């Protein structure tokens, strides 16, 4: 009898331990799933630069086939836009049709603006603020404050290292003073700005040597890093806000980010390369 009671008691203890362990493991698993993952915003800036390289090679390949098709600024801008769209369609980060559509839609907005500048004879293609008018009511006062400070950094510095250092300090302020929702747009903007300035600092001569002599891409004035960077950031911010409204997700390595990343990448690539082409033409 004692043997049976002992066996039954042992069974109860074992069952209790099993349930306790299972509950603990389930709780840990549940906690790990709900724990937010850290976002590497640098991936957005890096993808932006990949887009610029892609478009450079796209334009180089297509102009080599028949240079006579690209006699005007509008012709060249149209080719650049097609290259931008092809990049977004093949981007490793945009993993589904919805994300690709968000990115392409946002990339079209700066090209529409640049085309209107060409048609109306407007020389300046720089937006006044670091965000398009259509998202003004969707940004918080804090976001506008930070973006205005970023505007000052881009306007008041001609040295690329000074600009990057200024943006790094601004990122510290964003992390300490802004909400999680505000940070996404702002930190993607600083990432885009840093990567864009570095790219054109390193590659502007490459673009000019490839296309400048053949197409006489020169405006007779010094290339403005600030102008490119400001358009980059502005359309990246606009694209990010619009992408967040539309929704969708972007896979960045082990991360899955909301649709603002797709919009930010699309808007920034179009804003950067379109403005740069109009400057050097």
Language model features by range: what are they?
Residues 3-6, 30-220:
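Acidic/polar, low-complexity intrinsically disordered N-terminal segments immediately downstream
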Residues 23-27:
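C-terminal motif of bacterial Sec signal peptides marking the signal peptidase cleavage site
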């Amino acid at each position: 009898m004692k043997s049976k009671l002992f066996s039954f008691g042992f069974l109860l203890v074992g069952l209790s331990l099993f349930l306790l362990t299972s509950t603990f493991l389930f709780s840990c698993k549940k906690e790990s799933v709900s724990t937010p993952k850290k976002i590497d915003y640098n991936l957005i800036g890096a993808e932006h630069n990949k887009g610029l390289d892609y478009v450079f090679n796209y334009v180089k390949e297509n102009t080599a086939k028949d240079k006579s098709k690209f006699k005007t600024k509008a012709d060249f801008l149209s080719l650049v836009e097609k290259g931008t769209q092809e990049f977004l369609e093949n981007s490793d980060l945009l993993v589904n049709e919805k994300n690709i559509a968000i990115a392409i839609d946002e990339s079209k907005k700066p090209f529409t603006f640049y085309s209107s500048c060409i048609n109306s004879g407007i020389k300046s293609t720089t937006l006044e603020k670091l965000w398009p008018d259509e998202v003004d009511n969707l940004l918080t006062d804090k976001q506008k404050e930070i973006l205005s400070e970023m505007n000052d950094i881009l306007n008041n510095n001609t040295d690329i290292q000074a600009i990057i250092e200024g943006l790094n300090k601004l990122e510290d302020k964003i992390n300490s003073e802004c909400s999680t929702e505000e940070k996404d747009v702002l930190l993607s903007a600083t990432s885009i700005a840093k990567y864009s300035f570095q790219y054109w600092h390193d590659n502007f001569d490459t673009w000019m040597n490839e296309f400048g002599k053949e197409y006489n891409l020169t405006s007779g004035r010094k290339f403005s890093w600030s102008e490119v960077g400001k358009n980059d950031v502005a359309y990246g911010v606009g694209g990010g806000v619009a992408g967040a409204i539309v929704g969708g997700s972007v896979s960045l390595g082990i991360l899955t980010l909301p649709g603002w990343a797709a919009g930010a990448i699309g808007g920034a690539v179009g804003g950067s390369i379109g403005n740069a082409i109009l400057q050097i033409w």
